[in-house]
């Protein structure tokens, strides 16, 4: 008698939950407490439900623009900090499109170049900044201004979300050492990974009030604290731009628990007449970064009970990669901390800091050569030199790349040199950073003068061609530029030459 085999059906496995998107995380957060205030800005305040609806309406409007021009699926954002900036990001996430923040400090010519390079189909404009109308008309790019936004429908959007975790949701332009800025492509998954890192680092909860004064056209202002706090259900206090008086007023009026600073802002606050009597007790901590933070500034804040948590990263890392916990801010001021969350860090040749993890960019927009140079087997080459101490803390020591950092803004010398070379009376030129007590560094033009050279005319030549913060403050004339055996400008020798007394 043969045995009878009875086959039992396998129990059905529940379907795996879909991977979260930027929109799904925000939508879930808004559903928990729809009436809670999400954002304060110059126009008033907005609840989570109101921000959710505005974001969805903008997302639908963006899709219409993208369908009108299928080859252009990017949305520019030009304007000072506002709730609309956050709604633009969230609307793009819902629609499966990418937001491109535009630095309003740049010259109009630079705005237009970026709009073309990113293939924008529309630009959201606000708070006194507008793209040139003739350019927008010629390139068939739609302008979405405040009046258009006010006229958006108020009923809920019923269309399904189109975004997915792998979609590029932000293209952040970053100054490169070779001249033109490059667009770093960040996916929704990268933005969410950064949010997790930030929430753990700063211990962000729904009870927090985060003061954002730094511009959100930079990934630092947008994504070190602001978006992570929004996804945690906190309240965001947006200032259009940094103003020391407004900062001290906000301490009294809104009692923020967290904020983000750069050295130039810290210096301005410490030197302000209200610093000595200001009540900083509501601040649990402040993040700081963008360039080396002087120990004297760290001490000025920490002596008032506010730990300065240094953050290291770049646009390409969304941006947090290495950072200090609150405990380490007290224990090792000046260190940049340890790799955050799922991020890995190592020292490459020459002590270069190299990073790998879920928040790293997918690459540079339409630039495979630059991508291949910066991303090697998944490791992002930062171009910065660092070290690791016996306790495992990381320290920033120098830059491999020739970059000027002025008031928290990255300035590519090659970009400035391209304009300088066209100025009348300039035979040869180079641009280097000169130490400055207020800004950290400012650009200095070094030229070999020819017929018709006039320093005032050279400095005036930059007006309208480059943003004010990129323009050299002075010109140093040298008989010849020192060069290496390969013919490249010898930067250490050039710095020594212009620093030496005449």
Predicted regions and their residues:
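AMP-binding/adenylate-forming catalytic core of the ANL superfamily
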Residues: 60, 85, 347-349, 357, ...
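Conserved AMP-binding/adenylation subdomain of ANL enzymes
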Residues: 192-209, 217-258, 271-274
